[in-house]
């Protein structure tokens, strides 16, 4: 991360904002190590600088910060994407979405029923984690490759702390899920660190191959994380596996993307 990055890629409605990332501190020190912050932290910073009137709170029932209003207006949601990416809908906690160099963040007014659907998912995740005594146990892991299909049930994910420069020890991500299955000899996968891929800034781990299916060019593995009860389009933002934090979703699915 370039800590002196001055980014113009933040929009609230039709208004754009600049910020100096060296000035930011996270409101989630239990998740991020010093020097790292989330998309939500960018909003808090804009509020503290007087650029917007931000009202927010932390809701423990959802394990996330929520925006109550911006400049007196309610019902905000967001989309974001990383360098060389494109806009994607999501149902991912904004304070878990790591800010990276070259990222874009845009907030927009959403339908209240849409927001309540997302908040319901968050509450279900927290409840599931509590019912499992704080352990992350995935109801189902699905793998649908070019040449294989596998499913695993009740997968307890173990933190490997491979992103310990960014996250506090014990944080669990999609990367940890893959490493858990690999350590148990349930899958054979090759995971490598990429600083860049083509022109895109990555700075994360990439699933290169899984049980013989290996990516090439734009063909390879993608994934989604979410709930079977809600439309799946919200669960596929292109977030690298090392920085997609997991609380306790219904499932994780890896699929072959052409």
Mark where each language-model region is:
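Ubiquitin-like/PB1-type beta-grasp interaction modules and other compact soluble beta-rich domains
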Residues: 1-258
């Amino acid at each position: 991360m370039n800590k002196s990055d001055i980014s113009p890629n933040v929009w609230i409605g039709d208004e754009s904002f600049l910020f100096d990332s060296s000035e930011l501190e996270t409101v989630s020190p239990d998740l991020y190590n010093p020097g790292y912050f989330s998309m939500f932290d960018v909003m808090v910073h804009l509020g503290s600088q007087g650029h917007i009137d931000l009202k927010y709170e932390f809701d423990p029932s959802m394990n996330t910060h929520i925006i109550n209003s911006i400049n007196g207006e309610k019902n905000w949601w967001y989309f974001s994407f990383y360098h060389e990416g494109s806009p994607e809908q999501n149902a991912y906690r904004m304070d878990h979405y790591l800010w990276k160099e070259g990222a874009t963040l845009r907030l927009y007014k959403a339908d209240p029923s849409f927001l309540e659907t997302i908040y319901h998912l968050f509450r279900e995740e927290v409840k599931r984690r509590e019912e499992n005594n704080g352990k992350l146990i995935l109801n189902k892991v699905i793998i649908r490759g070019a040449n294989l299909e596998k499913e695993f049930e009740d997968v307890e994910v173990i933190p490997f702390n491979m992103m310990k420069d960014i996250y506090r020890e014990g944080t669990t991500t999609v990367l940890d899920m893959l490493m858990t299955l690999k350590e148990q000899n349930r899958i054979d996968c090759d995971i490598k660190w990429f600083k860049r891929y083509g022109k895109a800034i990555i700075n994360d781990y990439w699933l290169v191959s899984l049980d013989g299916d290996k990516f090439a060019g734009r063909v390879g593995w993608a994934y989604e994380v979410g709930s079977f009860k809600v439309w799946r389009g919200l669960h596929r933002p292109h977030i690298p596996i090392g920085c997609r934090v997991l609380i306790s979703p219904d499932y994780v699915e890896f699929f072959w993307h052409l």
